[in-house]
Amino acid sequence: MKPVIALVGRPNVGKSTLFNRLTRSRDALVADLPGLTRDRHYGEGRVGERPYLVVDTGGFEPVAKDGILHEMARQTRQAVEEADVVVFIVDGRNGLAPQDKSIADYLRKTGRPIFLVVNKAEGMKYTAVATDFYELGLGDPRAISAAHGDGVTDMINEALEVAYAGQPEEAEEDDPSRGIKIAIVGRPNVGKSTLVNALIGEDRVIAFDMPGTTRDSIYVDFERNGKKYTLIDTAGLRRRGKVFEAIEKFSVVKTLQSISDANVVILLLDAQQDISDQDAHIAGFVVEQGRALVIGVNKWDGFDDHARDRAKADLTRKLKFLDFAKSHFISAAKKTGIGALMRSVDDAYAAAMSKLPTPKLTRALIEAVEFQQPRRRGPVRPKLRYAHQGGQNPPIIVIHGNALDAVTETYKRYLENRFRETFSLTGTPLRIEFRSSNNPYADKG
């Protein structure tokens, strides 16, 4: 599982600036659950080969009793509970504030590793910046400038050393005797627990828990029709006797972790509710992570033809970017449609792990170009010469040629569709990379 780093501090100390620098993006996944008055932002960062999730919390007022500040404090506490490391940010220009002391008092009691970070320290001597903050009793302050990047790399490297040291051994997760790793994700109350119980109970398979992180990640191994599968961190489901039930707290962090760890993701939607921005955000993270995907539309039973047509149209319109994934209309409660859903899981996994021979890829590329050439950009027309596979899960196709920076997104999409059709790559994202020759004359004509 990717470790989680939570950014905590009072308002306006630079948490969002640091978040944007760590994730190298201004785009963030947002938890827009009903009733939340201030969203937490989630993103992914990476240092070398070490990925991590980072949470940008709202301004923290631990003693707030009601209203928006109370709600923001509640959400921050949840983020701290889910974090492997907490980065506590204070303002070096404005100095120590009473709220900083209240936050420090709370954080000391959590038992989480705390990194005290003094932001906005550019142009200031370390001793002048840090002295006041020793009073918080959280060890040596680390001076940074989130806006300029000063000190950020060293700080995050130290934080990741601690975060990864606390991660469980992954030998169990990577055991080759295990089957396809599946994450079932979706909003609260879409029927995840019902689907899990339908899957593990249908063949009278004994399911068992395998402890993961200290925050109760679950691994459930089961067989179906002679095939092995593993449900990984069922994200909001906990064992109650012989069945799984939804718990009261929906965790976006656990959802993102389970997506990252999966081979195939089942995105479960509720046919009786409109597709929300949150559904689209979760789906977008699946694609960003390159995970194979199957869509399950639950609670389908009882719909008349008109309602079904409307639900299908809503799915096509709002999740158009998932057109590579198969959709299944199911009833987890009545166990209808689940067989076809699982067959698509198998197909999506097979597609994600496909081996694409260079001669066949190049032949498919040439046929695609002969059928429709890329457009010129000024005097230059891109020349696509040959292709080979650059990776699996998701499949990566590397195309070599000349002037390939002139290839449009529309033409790239055309090539993707041609490759999907030729190699039956349904259910998996597909990456296409272009590598141009340095010959400035080879692309003329």
UniProtKB/Swiss-Prot annotation:
Residues 3-167, 180-353 form the EngA-type G domain. SMART domains: AAA. Transmembrane segments: none annotated. Residues 354-438 form the KH-like domain. GTP 1 binds at residues 9-16, 56-60, 119-122. The keyword Nucleotide-binding applies. InterPro entries: AAA+_ATPase, G_ENGA, GTP-bd, GTPase_Der, KH_dom-like, KH_dom-like_a/b, P-loop_NTPase, Small_GTP-bd. GTP 2 binds at residues 186-193, 233-237, 298-301. GO terms for molecular function: ATP hydrolysis activity; GTP binding; ribosome binding. SUPFAM superfamilies: P-loop containing nucleoside triphosphate hydrolases (SSF52540). Associates with the 50S ribosomal subunit. GTPase that plays an essential role in the late steps of ribosome biogenesis. This is GTPase Der. It comes from Burkholderia cenocepacia (strain ATCC BAA-245 / DSM 16553 / LMG 16656 / NCTC 13227 / J2315 / CF5610).
